[in-house]
């Protein structure tokens, strides 16, 4: 249906008529016609009083202009079952949502053909693991309970319960566990990483240890409330 009004995180939200204990909540999922959103973003950018936020500024302004803004129910009208949704506005929530994907039967299954993900897929060579511990004991390219895309090379290191982005290089005798590594990350020999998010284009030097001593990690990186270590994009270590 068409939206009559929009409030962003009000202290006393308006309730649903005849349901005083319930409210309609925005899930932050938007679909726009390109010319419309382009114009709205230009208008908002010129507004010095705007916080440049979709919920606080852009959507309410569209309603003031009388534009057609509609809302769609999260529930499946036929099955009456809620589909998958996670609020990933906080780093800890983002981490947990990603870790869900490496479960044996995740709630959100990337391999579900009924819910394909349509996005641009850059072409990379296949991922590969090298070294099987035959020449040097402990030098094993091993991946367990993890997701690794094209362009990745696991060269004698271990990746356990982790998610890698394209073009990640893991060198020998390293161990990556319960972590998220973004595109272009290189991890040198003997490094150990646990419960961390390593952003793009970070080079982890030889012997570096992240996630095992949070007090030490706090001196160099950001650590969330739940103990996830975040290494920012392009950080030089």
Please report, for each region that a protein language model flagged, where it lies by residue.
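Left-handed beta-helix
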Residues: 35, 44-237
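Conserved core of the sugar-phosphate nucleotidyltransferase
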Residues: 1-35, 39
């Amino acid at each position: 249906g068409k939206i009559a009004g929009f409030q962003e995180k009000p202290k006393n939200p308006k309730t649903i008529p005849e349901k005083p204990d319930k409210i309609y909540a925005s899930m932050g999922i938007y679909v726009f016609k390109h010319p419309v959103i382009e114009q709205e973003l230009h208008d908002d950018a010129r507004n010095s009083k705007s916080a440049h936020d979709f919920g606080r500024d852009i959507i309410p302004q569209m309603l003031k202009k009388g534009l057609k803004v509609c809302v769609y129910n999260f529930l499946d009208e036929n099955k009456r079952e809620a589909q998958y949704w996670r609020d990933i506005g906080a780093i800890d929530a983002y981490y947990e949502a990603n870790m869900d994907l490496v479960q044996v039967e995740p709630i959100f299954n990337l391999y579900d053909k009924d819910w394909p993900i349509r996005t641009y897929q850059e072409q990379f060579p296949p991922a590969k693991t090298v070294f099987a511990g035959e020449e040097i004991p402990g030098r094993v390219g091993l991946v367990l309970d993890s997701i690794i895309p094209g362009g990745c090379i696991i060269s004698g290191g271990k990746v356990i319960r982790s998610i890698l982005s394209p073009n990640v290089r893991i060198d020998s005798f390293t161990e990556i566990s319960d972590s998220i590594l973004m595109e272009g990350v290189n991890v040198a020999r003997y490094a150990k990483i646990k419960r961390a998010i390593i952003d793009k284009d970070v080079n982890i030097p030889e012997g570096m240890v992240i996630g095992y001593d949070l007090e030490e990690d706090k001196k160099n990186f950001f650590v969330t409330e739940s103990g996830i270590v975040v290494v920012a994009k392009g950080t030089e270590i």
